[in-house]
């Protein structure tokens, strides 16, 4: 227990609810909150989008758009801009929200933005094997790392955009 250092046990607090971790000493309920992640579909001046090939698990060697976890206390849109700079080496302007993706029994909630590149000098970081730009027809659909990557790209190309969110 983070409050009193006693042992936690799994208990069902209310009929029909999922089990929660509860401290046997002080009764504190430990809620296992989801992680919040951001991704950014970045269009270059020629409308090609930026993708990176992962150098880390999960999804080693597979393609994603730049993204990562939101730090505690960080504004989600700020995290999207930061991750684009870290993973692609470019500055971006957010154009709006594509959508939010979550899946049963998966901890991350993924918030995906559409963006335009402000700078054009792409460079990948140590979390990526390479960086490239793709037209819609060139995207390596069979080599995408995550379900959320596929769904967000399909939504993006279908014109899904909520422009007043950032």
What are these regions (language model features)?
Residues 2-40:
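Acidic, metal-coordinating catalytic segment for phosphate/diphosphate chemistry
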Residues 9, 105, 124-166:
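Nudix hydrolase/Nudix homology domain
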Residues 9-12, 91-98:
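A short coil-to-beta-strand element that immediately follows conserved catalytic motifs
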Residues 22, 37, 50-51, 64, ...:
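Conserved beta-strand segments that form the floor/walls of ligand-binding pockets within enzyme
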Residues 33, 101-123, 152, 157-160:
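Active-site-adjacent beta-strand/loop module that shapes the phosphate/pyrophosphate-binding cleft
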Residues 42-43, 51, 115, 133:
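Conserved hydrophobic "DFG−1" position in protein kinase catalytic cores
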Residues 43-86:
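Conserved Nudix-box catalytic region and its N-terminal flanking loop in Nudix hydrolases
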């Amino acid at each position: 227990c983070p409050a009193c250092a006693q042992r936690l046990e799994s208990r069902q607090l209310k009929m029909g609810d999922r089990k929660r971790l509860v401290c046997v000493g002080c009764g504190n309920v430990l809620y296992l909150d989801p992680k919040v992640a951001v991704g950014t579909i970045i269009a270059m001046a020629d409308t090609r989008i930026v993708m990176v090939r992962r150098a880390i698990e999960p999804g080693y060697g597979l393609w994603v758009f730049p993204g990562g976890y939101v730090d505690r206390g960080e504004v989600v849109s700020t995290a999207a801009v930061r991750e684009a700079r870290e993973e692609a080496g470019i500055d971006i302007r957010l154009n709006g929200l594509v959508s939010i993706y979550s899946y049963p029994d998966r901890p991350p909630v993924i918030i995906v933005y559409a963006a335009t590149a402000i700078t054009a000098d792409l460079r990948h970081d140590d979390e990526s094997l390479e960086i490239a730009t793709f037209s819609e027809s060139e995207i390596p659909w069979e080599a995408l790392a995550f379900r959320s990557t596929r769904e967000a790209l399909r939504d993006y190309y279908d014109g899904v955009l909520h422009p007043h969110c950032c």
